[in-house]
UniProtKB/Swiss-Prot annotation:
Its EC number is 2.8.4.3. Catalyzes the methylthiolation of N6-(dimethylallyl)adenosine (i(6)A), leading to the formation of 2-methylthio-N6-(dimethylallyl)adenosine (ms(2)i(6)A) at position 37 in tRNAs that read codons beginning with uridine. This is tRNA-2-methylthio-N(6)-dimethylallyladenosine synthase. The gene is miaB. InterPro entries: Elp3/MiaA/NifB-like_rSAM, Methylthiotransferase, Methylthiotransferase_CS, Methylthiotransferase_N, Methylthiotransferase_N_sf, MiaB_methiolase, rSAM, rSAM_horseshoe. [4Fe-4S] cluster 1 binds at C11, C48, C82.
Length: 475
């Protein structure tokens, strides 16, 4: 059987895209996924342009693959993702042995591209933005365990001064709500218990309904939570300026929505936030967190931070450290600023030394790690509901799973627990994981069973006095 290897860099959206590519090419060309690139007949590199020197990293990887192409002339090499979208034809200028260059919105065309290359075409570059067509042509979802990612939208309209996403993935496009619910219902039928809704800015979701109306993100969350079998709902990533009160209300009345939120602030200094074009202040961000904790007192927050943004002063950084303490972040993805070509911030003078940037990053991460450990220690002796994912990586005789607040828990259990929930008493706390003992299995929990996605959709379809259909969410 012909084999496919995909190297994936970057965000969860890229991981989702790579899984869809693998499923698609398996169904159309019978390509079997392999983790050994030297065995592959098709090599795909799914790239990320967020970090510094992303382009050079791509060409370095392609250089290693070039030699395999000499030994195997029929080997097809493709480059996708955000660097492909940014660089386009330039990739083939520097690496003419690359057969296919495709963007995040054209991965669904890979079967046709491969057929054309096998039919004698020299090379194909397709980095267009065909909007929702991508989702219409992907294969049915396939569960790989009790958790799954589901893309609900793509792109971003915010144009933060440091970010390439609007240029590489396009502007915001939301999937129709029925399509999202149907995909999640299919996954639930395959045993998925937790879904993570994906998008560059999920709270901007505005999906079309069956009657031509619009479903907001808050409404979508309630609909997803009502699907039979789905007992946990997560989402990533969101933007503070669209974190509206209706979303906060979902935290009040929807227990399936986890008490853990990733809401990036990037900086705690208003001056820096203005230069970043974030369109909110630190006070406005903290107001969102305050309202969230009024309805979910135990919610834990993670964030992204950019350290050393052009013009960031020592006082600006102290403001960031102050916000970290005030919000009491649990986790963070924090990076030293690196200019992305084509973004407005790339034209700003980089006036901070590398030594200072590294010192600030180390101090920030140390503070976040300290706070995270405090949260973990507070869990000692408590009972935590854990979704069992499979054997532990540290000891195959044990099981591992995750808590609602994303902590890894290792424990002794039986194989029939995999894919189900167990209540664990936490007995030990480590830097990157917890350990505990089973006190309750899922059969003893009495988890609710509501209804299928189809019945949710049918129940929310209403008509007005004129007999015109309208979409009502009343769960």
């Amino acid at each position: 059987m012909a084999k496919l290897h995909i190297t994936t860099w970057g965000c969860q959206m890229n991981e989702y895209d790579s899984s869809k590519m693998a499923d698609l090419l398996n169904s159309t060309h019978g390509l079997e996924l392999t983790d050994k690139p030297e065995e592959a007949d098709v090599l795909l590199l799914n790239t990320c342009s967020i970090r510094e020197k992303a382009q050079e990293k791509v060409f370095s990887q392609l250089g290693r693959w070039k030699n395999w192409k000499k030994d195997k002339p029929d080997l097809i090499i493709g480059v996708g993702g955000c660097v492909a979208s940014q660089e386009g034809e330039h990739i083939r200028d520097r690496a003419p042995f690359v057969d296919i260059v495709f963007g995040p919105q054209t991965l669904h065309r890979l079967p046709e591209m491969i057929n054309k290359i096998r039919g004698g075409d020299r090379a194909i570059v397709d980095i267009s933005f065909p909007e929702i067509e991508k989702f219409d042509r992907l294969p049915e979802p396939r569960a790989e365990g009790p958790t799954a990612f589901v893309s609900i939208m793509e792109g971003c309209n915010k144009y933060c001064s440091f970010c390439v996403v609007p240029y590489t993935r396009g502007e915001e496009v939301s999937r129709p709500v029925d399509d999202v619910l149907f995909e999640i219902a299919q996954l639930a039928e395959q045993g998925v218990r937790e879904v993570n809704l994906l998008g560059q800015n999920v709270n901007a979701y505005r999906g079309e309904t069956f009657d031509g109306g619009i479903c907001t993100f808050a409404e979508l969350l309630r609909l997803v939570a009502a699907i039979d079998g789905i007992d946990r709902v997560r989402y990533t990533t969101s933007h503070p300026i669209e974190f509206t009160d209706d979303i906060i209300e979902v935290y009040r009345d929807t227990p399936e929505l986890v008490s853990f939120l990733h809401l990036p602030i990037q900086s705690g200094a208003d001056r820096v936030l203005t230069m970043m074009k974030r369109n909110h202040t630190a006070l406005e961000y903290k107001a969102i967190i305050r309202k969230l904790r009024e309805v979910r007192p135990n919610i834990q927050i993670s964030s992204d931070f950019i350290v050393g943004f052009p013009g960031e002063t020592a006082e600006d950084f102290e403001q960031t450290m102050k916000v970290i303490e005030q919000v009491n972040f649990d986790m963070s993805f924090s990076f030293i600023y690196s200019a992305r070509p084509g973004t407005p911030a790339a034209d700003l003078p980089d006036d901070i030394s590398e030594e200072e940037k590294k010192a600030r990053l180390a101090r920030l991460q140390q503070r976040i790690n300290h706070q995270a450990m405090q949260f973990s220690r507070a869990m000692l002796g408590t009972e935590q509901r854990v979704l069992v994912e499979g054997p532990s990586k540290k000891d195959i005789m044990e099981l591992t799973g995750r808590t609602e607040n994303n902590r890894i828990v290792n424990f002794q259990g039986t194989p029939d627990m995999i894919g189900k929930f167990v209540d664990i008493k936490i007995t030990d706390v480590y830097t990157n994981s917890l350990r505990g003992e089973v006190v309750r299995t899922e059969d003893e929990m009495g988890l609710r069973v509501v209804e299928s996605a189809a019945s949710v959709i049918a129940r929310t379809r209403k008509e007005d006095d004129l007999g015109v259909g309208k979409y009502v969410v009343n769960l």
